[in-house]
């Protein structure tokens, strides 16, 4: 069973106008070395926010946004609170509406929350009569995301939950025009910080609904709109989830932005695009696994970062090497391939990126899932059932000795493993290992093995 990551809190926020963003805090703790690195090479500051400047000391979030499909993002800051013009008095929900508000549904449940990466999707701008539409939108959006590698190969690691947030009006504020104001449960609105495509939300309201789900590692707000836009928040809430995303429910590009943004949250990957005005990077070696000051020859000689992949053909096209430009700088930083999804929407993850994503999945989920509890002793005829990713195998052992005939089986009984009715206590252990060739780093491969032990009373 994978141990849950420790809860932590960050007010840093990233947003993207253009679709889902599933981003997360990049580290629970920082070493003294990392702190020194951060001091030596601070991130470029975002430009001043128009809204933040106008509203003084109001709490703000740093954001990243896309102004159009396929464009590279820009950075700014936005107010954390819903603008006053949108914070008008809400009509109370009727009794039937209130009864439906906050309902939780399992869209996809592959196993217990302790074993899985749990994604919670909350609807906004859907009336009580439109909740079935919301559920259909959740299924559609997740199908698009999970068709992309490495998601497609690891669907068994995810649970997806929907939480119904009943709105008084259909649609969201700012759609189609800036003057449109809608009475919705989560206060989603376009024109955040006067940027048309930036789709912001009341994060406190989001947290109140997310708390209704069995568990939440990532949270998505699906806003009832066809308009191009979205926002994502890189934070960890006080109830434990990493990241909030907003997205237009019916825009075709939102899933691609989601995949890009989870590269940050789950894969801890840097952006691979750059801006000419940033000049030359002169700071310390970046922390992210897909950005380096080193050349391909230096990476190989020093056995650093993606050196194991250099020279191999990558699914995003071309060969893994060291391509100049990345992490916003055109000079002084190299990226693994010319044009992965961390640079351009619609592309694939490159080989180092896929490795990082798979490792990110396993930081939340386990290679071995089971609904058979380990708290109480089992009888000889009790069924032990497990779940595995497609690329994983399992070995079974009794009292520390492997039962080779049971290799690969996903359902066994202690009796079928050879435990006799001898009146003694025994243990049954399942050990699962993901044998994917997409993860080469030995340190990351340690995340790909998990085991579970049951006591048996014969």
Name every feature range the model reports, one short phrase each.
Residues 128-132, 229-230, 349-353:
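Short, solvent-exposed loop/turn elements at domain surfaces
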Residues 1-41:
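Secretory targeting and sorting signals
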Residues 134-141, 154, 254, 258, ...:
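Stable alpha-helical elements in mature extracytoplasmic
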Residues 131-150, 331-348:
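Short, solvent-exposed linear motifs at loop/edge-of-secondary-structure regions
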Residues 416-421:
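Short, flexible loop/turn segments at beta-strand junctions in immunoglobulin-like
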Residues 99-118, 122-127, 143-278:
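Active-site-proximal segment of zinc-dependent metalloprotease catalytic domains
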Residues 2-7, 39-147, 385-388, 392-398, ...:
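Zymogen propeptides/activation segments of proteases
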């Amino acid at each position: 069973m994978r141990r849950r990551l420790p809860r932590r809190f960050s007010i840093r926020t990233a947003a993207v106008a253009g679709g889902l963003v599933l981003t997360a805090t990049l580290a629970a703790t920082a070493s003294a070395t990392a702190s020194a690195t951060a001091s030596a090479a601070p991130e470029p500051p975002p430009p001043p926010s128009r809204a933040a400047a106008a509203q003084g000391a109001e709490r703000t979030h740093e954001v990243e946004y896309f102004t159009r499909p396929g464009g590279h993002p820009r950075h700014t800051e936005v107010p954390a609170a819903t603008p006053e013009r949108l914070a008008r008095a809400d009509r109370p929900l009727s009794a039937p509406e209130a009864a439906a508000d906050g309902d939780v549904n399992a869209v996809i449940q592959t196993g217990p929350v302790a074993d899985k990466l749990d994604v919670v999707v909350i609807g906004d701008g859907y009336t009580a009569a439109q909740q079935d539409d919301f559920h259909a939108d959740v299924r559609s959006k997740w199908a698009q995301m999970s068709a992309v590698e490495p998601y497609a190969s690891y669907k068994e690691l995810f649970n997806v939950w929907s939480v119904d947030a009943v709105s008084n009006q259909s649609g969201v504020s700012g759609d189609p025009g800036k003057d449109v104001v809608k009475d919705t449960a989560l206060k989603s609105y376009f024109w955040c910080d006067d940027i048309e495509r930036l789709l912001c939300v009341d994060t406190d309201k989001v947290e109140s609904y997310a708390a209704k789900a069995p568990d939440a590692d990532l949270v998505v707000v699906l806003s009832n709109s066809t308009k191009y836009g979205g926002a994502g928040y890189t934070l960890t809430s006080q109830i434990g989830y990493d990241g909030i995303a907003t997205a237009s429910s019916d825009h075709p590009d939102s899933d691609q932005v989601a995949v890009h943004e989870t590269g940050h949250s789950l894969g801890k990957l840097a952006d691979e695009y750059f801006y000419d005005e940033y000049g030359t990077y002169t700071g310390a070696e970046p922390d992210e696994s897909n950005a380096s000051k080193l050349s391909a020859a230096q990476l190989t000689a020093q056995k650093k970062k993606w050196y194991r992949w250099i020279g191999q053909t990558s699914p995003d096209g071309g060969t893994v090497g060291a391509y100049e430009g990345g992490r916003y700088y055109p000079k002084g930083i190299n990226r693994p391939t010319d044009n992965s999804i961390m640079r351009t929407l619609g592309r694939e993850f490159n080989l180092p990126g896929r490795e990082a994503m798979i490792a990110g999945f396993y930081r939340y989920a386990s290679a071995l899932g089971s609904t058979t509890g380990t708290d109480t002793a089992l009888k000889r005829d009790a069924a032990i059932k497990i779940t595995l990713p497609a690329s994983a195998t399992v070995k079974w052992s009794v009292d520390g000795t492997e039962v080779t005939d049971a290799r690969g089986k996903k359902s066994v009984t202690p009796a079928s493993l050879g435990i006799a009715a001898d009146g003694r206590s025994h243990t049954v252990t399942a050990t699962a290992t993901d044998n994917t060739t997409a993860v080469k780093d030995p340190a990351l491969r340690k995340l790909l093995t998990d085991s579970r032990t049951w006591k048996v009373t014969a």
